[in-house]
Amino acid sequence: MEITAQMVKELRESTGAGMMDCKKALGEANGDMEKAVDILREKGLGQAAKKADRLASEGLVSVEVCSKCKKATISEINSETDFVARNPQFQALAKDATAHIQSSGIKTVEELNTSTLNGVKFEEYFKTQIATIGENLVVRRFETISADDKGVVNGYVHSNGRVGVLIGAACESAEVANKAAEFIRNLCMHAAAMKPSVISYKDLDKDFVDKEFIALRAELEKENEELKRLGKP
């Protein structure tokens, strides 16, 4: 049976699934609209599409570090609620996606969606997860850093899953790099706690430094005035 544009349009409007998914489902159903709806439902595609316009403002940060500490990936995957962010299935999804990003050398969300995970396109795999978990999920961003033989990388995610850090360092030799992994991880933990904006004070914006200096000087002058009033040196 010929699958017309009108049929695809009607199925898309009734299910919220993508146009190509609707066309494929109608083909499998030989034009039977009800059967096509069932096919989409079985694949979770209609449910995933209907959830796609719902705000995903919670979520998790996930970090994957290779065994030799030469490559590390950090990703942020959002959910609608904190409840789902604490769901073991969602946590496993975040971990699997981050590992896949690293092993595949993926650099953009577009590349991720068209890549293959467990024998299926990641986009389809992700839609299935949305349907199963029951909330809109979004891969917001990710980044991978790497090091050569004389370098080391490591990462850390705070226990609440909301803060993650990757750090890479160049070392004097491969021997030093092999011994530095734990130290770099501790640096990541420190950065997660203190939230520094730059690596060195030399990287600070001059206007920021000037404003901080003025504020500090005013604070010291006020403190000195108070000591003078109390007759203290």
Question: What residues fall within each predicted segment?
Answer:
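N-terminal assembly/interaction segments in proteins that build large macromolecular machines
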Residues: E2-P233
